[in-house]
Amino acid sequence: MVGDEELAGLSRGERIELLRSRMGAPKLSTTSILQAPPELGQLLPQGGLARQAVTEIADCPALIVELISHTTAAGGHVGVVGWPELSLAGVSEQGNLDRVIVVPDPGVDPLGVAAVLVEGLDLVIVRSTGQLSPVRARPLLAKLRGGSAALVFVGVQIASPAARIGATVSTFRGIGPGRGRIQGLDIHVHVAAKGHRPMQGTMTVGRRAELRAV
């Protein structure tokens, strides 16, 4: 895993070269879909996230960690840009942290960092705020089309993404009256994908993973 300690003090060019050097592993697949966890895949067209395309996902860390765990456990490589407080402890339990590149502080050009990562990884997650105009998005999307990554924006709005996924934690599992510890989470998920009717369901991560489609 690449973190702040390796990027500290490096110029933008040096950061890019370091990131490029860590992307020599083969991609998970050349198919057009990055398979999602089965319980989420039931709601998504063809069971996963579109490669060479953008998906917007709500700011739900538990769902993002589940995506990272599933992708790395299947042999894929993941990049996370601009999310220093995201805990990857769950990935070490179910996935493979050695297949994760983390750039907590991408500096003034997070899209430039993401553009490097989408050329060689399977899943790239960018967390920021605001709306991304077509002009600003164009260079990144050009790089995305040249690779095979699925690009996920968290907290960023972009015109016409392949899918928008809303996610809200609805239940904490394992906690009784005044005691216990969290062993799992129920997440209500809503998916709106191009060319498909909206889908929603409740996904449990942690102790038990299942989906009750609505």
Explain the meaning of each model-derived region.
Residues 1-80, 194, 214:
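Detector for small/aliphatic-rich hydrophobic stretches
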Residues 55, 79, 101-103, 152, ...:
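Hydrophobic/aromatic beta-strand patches that form the interior of the parallel beta-sheet core
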Residues 76, 97, 120-121, 147-150, ...:
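Short glycine-/polar-rich loops that comprise or flank the Walker A/P-loop
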Residues 77-141:
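Long, charge-dense
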Residues 88-92, 157-171:
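Glycine-rich, charge-decorated loop segments at or immediately adjacent to ligand/cofactor-binding or catalytic sites
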Residues 110-114, 162-163, 177:
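Short, charged, surface-exposed secondary-structure boundary motifs
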Residues 132-136, 141-143, 148-163:
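Long, charge-dense, solvent-exposed interaction surfaces that engage phosphate-rich ligands
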Residues 169-214:
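C-terminal functional extensions of proteins
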